């Protein structure tokens, strides 16, 4: 068998043509320090702020500090397997989390990994956790109401889609309960909810998820949780991960409600990281950019203009105060960033007024724009009535003789406080809120005993459902009060049937005789 030189030459040329240079160049560094959720590495001269790095043991880190000789890295996972001298390499990409419909109904960690035991999440969509907030021209005014189902909030501090409304108060005053009840009330409202639990005990998160499942709210909710046992970097990135998941829906024209519960713990985690990375401490030992940490997060909530799809993301950040001190550093920062605050008073809470909202210090900077017209009409004087009542109540304690007008205002105030009370997970549809507030402001409750007010409310709701469902439907569909005196006549009709407790007791006694 003879081998021709031409054939050998052709084979060599063919091999050369198909040859690919598969040499990959990776920039690597050496770990010089590791501990408390952070590491330092030398040799990563071209690393970028916020870039993901990969350690030898498969754990990722994120560049936080860029210094002359090394980089400071926050470790996104278990740092116990990383030792001094290990290799760390650049990935060339920034931190991303999975997004999309597949996450709805799931409980995930800040990396987007499922932790609810229901299997992996199959989605190939991701978004960076850090994203520039929509600009001024990309937004439109907040005008669409977000109904919380809580009478005191919908009447006094209304929230609109695209707004940032702070929930602030001492521990154990019902902050999380308001957020959870608001999520529950979004059923059938074309809203996707995201609950970000930052630094909350696993048992607490489990209880919250069980509550959401009980009311069918997990059908439209994503829960992102970073427990206290996890490294501080996980608590720090949790709200940004939740915001990225929400932005995916917002930019597709959908409406999102996101709860950050709570940002005090995120600030504490960021302070811990910054001090370990030897950043200069400022007021209360927080780093100088703690304001920017929260502002760049909360500014991502917006109502996009119609050209961008008209989607919205409404944020309810939660802040915990110490002894009601809203003038501390973090509370004042977040108050100045948000569009209003719901302040919960511990004294009111322990005296049985729940939700324990302080009408004097709570405010919504969007105001009546986020209310339906019917609610605006019936709740217009409510705040003034409450303020006057609080002022007169303290004056009346001195035992002075009061004229009839003052006594009438005190009586109206007592009944207003009673009407605004609401049990846990007892959401009220907006039409029913309008009906009971209409009855209150038109004097139908003035002659009732305070103890009868909530019974009157519940029986009125039942009566309207049974006999005047058309009036409720009219308020729901049009957003206006029914024409003419139809609502007034219906409530008067019910007044004639309602039996106050004293009369009911007398009737029962006569029947027994």
UniProtKB/Swiss-Prot annotation:
Protein EC: 7.1.2.2
Topology in the lipid bilayer: Peripheral membrane protein
Annotated site location: Required for activity: 362
A Pfam family of this chain: ATP-synt_ab_N
Residue numbers binding ATP: 169-176
GO cellular component: plasma membrane; proton-transporting ATP synthase complex
Signal peptide (UniProt feature, chain positions): none
GO MF, one example: proton-transporting ATP synthase activity, rotational mechanism
Keyword NAD among UniProt keywords: no
Major subcellular site: membrane
Keywords per UniProt: ATP synthesis, ATP-binding, Cell membrane, CF(1), Hydrogen ion transport, Ion transport, Membrane, Nucleotide-binding, Translocase, Transport
Catalytic activity, reaction form: ATP + H2O + 4 H(+)(in) = ADP + phosphate + 5 H(+)(out)
Subcellular location: Cell membrane
Function in brief: Produces ATP from ADP in the presence of a proton gradient across the membrane. The alpha chain is a regulatory subunit.
Record family assignment: Belongs to the ATPase alpha/beta chains family.
Quaternary state and interactors: F-type ATPases have 2 components, CF(1) - the catalytic core - and CF(0) - the membrane proton channel. CF(1) has five subunits: alpha(3), beta(3), gamma(1), delta(1), epsilon(1). CF(0) has three main subunits: a(1), b(2) and c(9-12). The alpha and beta chains form an alternating ring which encloses part of the gamma chain. CF(1) is attached to CF(0) by a central stalk formed by the gamma and epsilon chains, while a peripheral stalk is formed by the delta and b chains.
Name this polypeptide is given: ATP synthase subunit alpha
Organism expressing this protein natively: Levilactobacillus brevis (strain ATCC 367 / BCRC 12310 / CIP 105137 / JCM 1170 / LMG 11437 / NCIMB 947 / NCTC 947)
Organism phylogeny: Bacteria, Bacillati, Bacillota, Bacilli, Lactobacillales
